[in-house]
Amino acid sequence: MLWILIEASSSFIPAYVIERFYWEDRGMRIADVVIAEIVFAWVMLIGEIPFGLLSDRWGRKPFILAGFVCEWLSFTVLLEAYSLPAFLLAMALAGIGGAALSGALEAHVYETLRMHRREERFETIWRVISIGGLLTSGLAALVGSYAVRSVDLIWHYHVSWWVLLGTVLLTFFLKEASREQDGETSSLKTLLNGFSFRRVYVRILCLVLLYGATIDFVDEFWQLYLRDQTIPMVHFGFVFVLFQIMQAIGASLSRFRSPVGWAMIYIVCLAGLSVASPLVSIGLLGTLYLCYGWAEPYVTTVIQDVAPTNGRATFTSLISVIERLAVLGTGTLFVFVERVFSLQMTYAALGLVSLILLLLYSVTRTRQN
């Protein structure tokens, strides 16, 4: 129950529904947003493996707590941000928080279940946790959308600041799960050696990157995309709720276990966004989130199942680092296409990236260890 409360609390962020407009209102252009995302990705890239190694040695709770504290500090900076350096500082703090949290909460849940010999229920429980977070973020979007009619955009950031402070306080009540240690904690070199000899990791990577290298840009720019499609900002809260509901529905569809099928739908939707009309584009975006809602718990479960017991957080961080590198590459492509063509055409480029990764996944999937 506490896991669900923490996930729900950290997801109740009304600021997200007006995030891009808040940045734009304070002078940030699309290129500035991408630069900030790249800074976030680099900080995550640099910090994830060290945090993972320390988490495997010192436990999960300190890093879950540190992660939420940094995210709270990020919003503290955003409340007073009026220049690119200030926004970059906020993103750097968010990156540190993300690096500290990376794999820690999933590992805490998995290890707690394993301690009670119930690890086979991880995917089910993680899907419930995900659905709780999605529904709460949908509620936050409704609140944020309604409030934008009568209050300044900064109100959303004040509410988010207090909610994150509450999340920090909730985290103090987590109990560290006992971990089975097979000798000493795995070093990074040991994990890298094991990583290189297991082809299943390549398949996992392809699936992780298929979504991870593209969904960030869908998240960051759907507001501007729909605005360019002449959809009024007042409807964005309801649109966001639709996306969250679709993602929650996807998270509940655990019986439909077809990674290739879901990925193909995802790619078709990305490509369709480059030519879609306003109403169709909302449907395509909703379907994207449906696919991602199914994929995220599935991939998380697979990673936890194959991760070494005494290096779980480090292994998860290693996967995440590779994902961040892919985001950097995709971000470069995104900026190029947006400047040369349009924001709408960037979705075709994202679809191409996902298609290449799906082909790699299909090839490696046929080669059994």
Task: State where each predicted segment sits.
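Juxtamembrane intracellular "pre-TM" segments in multi-pass secondary transporters
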Residues: 175-206
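Symmetry-related core transmembrane helices of the 12-TM Major Facilitator Superfamily/SLC fold
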Residues: 133, 155-173, 347-363
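Conserved MFS/SLC helix-loop-helix module at the cytosolic interface between two early adjacent transmembrane helices
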Residues: 45-82
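Loop-to-transmembrane helix entry/capping segments in MFS-fold secondary transporters
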Residues: 30-31, 116-129, 233, 309-319
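C-terminal transmembrane helical hairpin of 12-TM major facilitator-type secondary transporters
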Residues: 259-299
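Helix-loop boundary and gating motifs at the non-cytosolic
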Residues: 1-46, 199-241
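C-terminal ends and interior cores of transmembrane alpha-helices
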Residues: 69-83, 87, 172, 265-278
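Cytoplasmic helix-loop-helix junction between adjacent transmembrane helices
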Residues: 92-133
